[in-house]
Design a protein with these regions (language model features):
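Single-stranded nucleic-acid nicking/binding segments centered on His-rich, glycine/basic loops
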Residues: 1-59
Length: 59
């Protein structure tokens, strides 16, 4: 997913299973809103989901 995303997820205690879920959500998402909604369904705050999306994209 990239060094910035990996560092963020590690620093915030995301475990391998959660990281796999995030990767899958990113691969399946059409845009940032879709991605954030998918993560929200798993309990991630929308704003954090949007931020993670930008980290993965490298924005």
């Amino acid at each position: 997913m990239g060094a910035r995303a990996d560092d963020y997820l590690s620093a915030h205690g995301y475990r391998p299973g959660s990281i796999q879920l995030i990767q899958k959500a990113y691969e399946e998402a059409d845009n940032v809103d879709d991605f954030a909604a998918k993560l929200s369904d798993e309990g991630v705050v929308i704003a954090e989901g949007r931020y993670i999306y930008t980290l993965i994209r490298g924005d």
